Amino acid sequence: MESIGELLSKRPDVRGNFDKLVAEVMKNEQVQAFISENQMTEDEIQRSYSKFYEFVKERKKFEEHEKMAAEGYEPVLTMNHGYADVSYQTTAELAARQEASSQLRRVKIIGLPKEMKHIDFYGDVFTDNQNQFDLFRKVENFIDNFPQEKGLYIYGDFGIGKSFIMAAMANELSSKKGASTTLLHYPTFISDLDFDNAKYWVNEIKKVEVLVLDDIGAEMNNAWVRDSILQVILQHRMQENLPTFFTSNLNMAELELHLAETKKTDEIWPAKRVMERVKYLASEVHLEGVNRRHE
């Protein structure tokens, strides 16, 4: 097989086209800047002609938004053992899309609207009164100091934004701290459990990085749910100091009464054991406001 040099010596027309192509490529400002930055010798430049050509051709496609083999990647020149090479790096736009996708994946929603993944902490959370603003600052403080701060037990009336601010917190933790949060509607979670899948789900939920048990106290309580599900989840999270949040229509004292009520009798001490773990994991906060669900 003939070398390029032999072919060029036999075909003046090819040589002329080649020289013209090289001259065109070498006029490219990015190629010139690369040669200057890397102080390339004449020999290195000559050995890089084909790569310079590839770069100029692919760069033109990229800048003119033509179809490329690797969408979302832009060609850049690099040095590779004495000659220029072309590599393809992620564009800022693709990197932003990938990060946005990663942020969404880090927020897991179970039994709640998926739209909660798009609630913005600073743009969407209501702070209409001092009480709401105080809660906002507590949650903001948790985010800023993550993972050192204790979780919160937020209770109050229906529709005042308890779940809303927890979703906003999860999204902000994902974007600001790269942290993963699971928001779990506790009554739905409990209603979907049975003896066959309970062990799997308890092991999954108890280990998540940040956990929000939403609407706790609204579930149908029984001894199995309280002692084999909730207690096991909270015990693990207490031992591992994993951030845990709760929302409820009940305050802590009312939740204890709810947990003590079973079909058999009032089981005060098992309920107290669970509440000791709740109190270890979270500080009680009363949220006040108007019901916004029907606005």
Residue ranges with predicted function:
Residues 1-71:
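N-terminal nucleic-acid engagement/recognition segments and initiation subdomains in replication
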Residues 55-112:
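Interdomain "pre-motor" coupling segment immediately N-terminal to P-loop NTPase/helicase cores
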Residues 111-146:
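N-terminal pre-Walker A segment at the start of P-loop NTPase domains
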Residues 127-137, 149, 155, 170-208, ...:
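Short glycine-rich substrate-engagement loop in P-loop NTPases that contacts/grips substrate
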Residues 146-167:
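Walker A/P-loop nucleotide-binding motif
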Residues 179-180, 207-210, 240-246:
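Loop/turn-to-beta-strand initiation segments
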Residues 215-216:
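Walker B catalytic acidic pair
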